[in-house]
Every structure is written in C-alpha cells, then in structure tokens.
Design a protein with these regions (language model features):
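PLP-dependent amino-acid enzyme catalytic core
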Residues: 1-139
C-alpha cells in the first residue's frame, strides 16, 4: 500500500494510463492525487481484508511520480475483492491475496475501464489458507 507499485509502473510505462485501486476507506493514494497533497488515514479506519493495502499515507515520492500521470483513484469493497479472488482461482487457476486482487476486483465490478490493451496486475499469493477457503465457498 501507499502507491509504490503504481509509481513504479508510471515510471516504467510512461505512456500508460495508471489506475490506482484501493480498498474503501483506505484510499490515501487516490485522495492524495485528488487533493494534490498527502492524505493520512483517519482515526477510525474501516476494517478490510486487504491488509497489504493499509498504509498510514502515501509516500511523498509516490505522489510526486503519480501526480499528473495517474487516473482518478478507484475503491473496491471487500466483497468485490472476494469475488475477484474466486474468479482468479476458478478461471485463471491463480491464488491471489486480497490486496493483490484489488485491480481485478475493480475491473470485474466495472469500476475501472477495460479494453483490448488493458493489463491487470494480479499479485501476491500470500493469503491465509482458512480465509481463502472461506472465500471460495462463499458465493
């Protein structure tokens, strides 16, 4: 969390539209981009299954790289993330941790544009086996 992956993509792929996807209530990068300044998490942030996407704030270097380069931020719900995890497992034979499935969740929920040139990063298999099993059976 904090925009490091998005900033790295922006540097590596300068002619590419970058869509930052974060869990609801933890959209510090998206809000920082919208406000033009660092935004910190509130005193009582909501819970989320996306534990890898829970920064206190974005880093100044990430905001500097992404400013003027990234599209408006997108947020996803835990249920949208679970649906993406199920999709990745059933259709792609991949195990994705919740935070790693956030971009796929945004695409599947219609919150981020998808066309023939879209690349969705599906990262991380570091997920609790019991939680992942519960996600798979919860349809």
């Amino acid at each position: 969390g904090g925009g490091g992956l998005a900033a790295g993509l922006a540097l590596a792929c300068p002619d590419t539209a970058i869509h930052v996807v974060e869990p609801e209530g933890w959209d510090m990068v998206g809000r920082a981009l919208a406000n033009g300044e660092i935004v910190h998490v509130g005193d009582d942030p909501p819970s989320t299954i996306c534990d890898a996407l829970q920064p206190d704030a974005t880093k100044p270097i990430n905001l500097a790289v992404l400013s003027g380069r990234a599209e408006p931020g997108v947020t996803v719900t835990d249920e949208e993330v679970r649906a993406a995890q199920r999709f990745a497992f059933a259709r792609l034979n991949l195990v994705a941790e919740p935070g790693g499935a956030a971009a796929l969740a945004a695409a599947l929920a219609g919150k981020a544009p998808v066309d023939e040139d879209t690349v969705i990063l599906l990262t991380g298999g570091n997920t609790d086996p019991a939680s992942f099993a519960a996600t798979l059976v919860d349809t």
